[in-house]
Design a protein with these regions (language model features):
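Short acidic low-complexity segments
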Residues: 39-41, 217-236
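NAD(P)-binding Rossmann-fold cofactor-contacting core
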Residues: 194-216
Length: 326
């Protein structure tokens, strides 16, 4: 029987085993390979597992072991998913795949977190209603999310026209934090032809990501801005992907003008344990701009699991059961 697992340290808190079990109703074993020694973890993978997820601090080390690299891994230079194939070990990046899937969903008006009767979004858990709404639509986008990059021209994804996005121009995506997940998010947005603004506390890291994106296609734009310009860039962006674990100083001071009115604004935050966008801030955003929406990190987790698990097994997992886990 095929076995799958997760390597990284620490990983005892991970939701991955429960998500995988739910996705396939316990059909396949999925285990935590808990050790701080990467070589030990990798050896255990080779000697007993069909595929593994990889989390911090092993993503770059795992990338270096791969015999075959997916397009996104070649650019991101990190992997969170290794699979045994007849040709060797193949690396993927399901952070990229999950964000790309979410971007395709919001392009159709899905992935929004609904509010309660008081107008406050509950971000301490993923909204089952929001996930169910996205789930009903996302399966048809999985194949598109896994397609190779569009290098031929700068265009909206999957043949959509700009009007299909609800924008009168190519969307501008602000990526805050360009570490592992942030770089994957930036590459996902770039692969769909979006204009990018990148910011990171270490500006050199953001510049390196911008250089990688330019090499994808010289028509792609990735502007690097310092963190002090967060508020200005937030106001300008149509899509914000927030990847840092703490709130930037300007976050709590965002105003109605920053949230905009009369046009969609989509926010995705990676951190689901202690999010920086709290209920008060989201309520202010929704009151300022009813077309703005916030998606919490558990939806990102769900989407990267959905795309990654299908690579593992060749079978689409049950998204309804996975949703119940988070």
């Amino acid at each position: 029987m095929k076995r799958f697992g997760l390597i990284g340290h620490p990983i005892a808190h991970s939701l991955s085993p429960a998500l995988f079990k739910a996705g396939y109703d316990g059909k396949y074993p999925y285990e935590l390979i808990e050790t701080a020694d990467f070589e030990e973890a990798y050896s255990r993978f080779l000697n007993g597992y069909e595929g593994i997820n990889v989390t911090a601090p092993f993503k770059e080390l795992a990338y270096s072991k791969a015999d075959i690299l997916s397009d996104e891994c070649r650019i991101i230079r990190a992997t969170n998913l290794l699979v045994r194939t007849p040709e060797g070990i193949k690396a993927y990046n399901s952070d990229y795949l999950g964000v790309r899937l979410w971007l395709q969903e919001v392009s159709e008006g899905f992935g929004k977190v609904p509010t309660t009767s008081s107008g406050t979004a509950d971000i301490n858990r993923a909204s089952s209603d929001a996930v169910a709404l996205a789930s009903a639509k996302c399966s048809k986008n999985i194949e598109a999310a896994m397609t190779p990059f569009e290098h031929s021209e700068k265009a909206c994804p999957s043949g959509l026209s700009q009007s299909d996005w609800g924008f009168r121009k190519v969307p501008t995506t602000l990526v805050v934090g360009t570490g592992g997940a942030g770089k994957a998010a930036a590459v996902a947005a770039a692969s769909l032809g979006m204009d990018l603004i990148l910011m990171n506390r270490s500006i050199g890291k953001a510049e390196a990501v911008a250089e990688s994106i330019f090499h994808m296609h010289d028509a792609l734009q990735a502007e690097v801005r310092p963190m002090k310009d967060f508020r200005e860039c937030f106001r300008k962006a149509d899509i914000i992907i927030y990847n840092i674990p703490t709130a930037v100083p300007d976050l709590s001071g965002l105003t109605s003008e920053d949230f905009g009115t009369g046009k969609p604004k989509f926010i995705l935050e990676a951190n689901y344990k202690d999010p920086s966008f709290d209920n008060e801030l989201i309520m202010k955003m929704k009151q300022s701009n009813p077309q703005a929406s916030y998606t919490g990190g558990k939806v990102w987790l769900l989407y990267q699991a959905l795309t990654g698990y299908e690579i593992f097994t060749g079978e689409t997992p049950d998204l309804t059961r996975m949703t119940a886990v988070i």
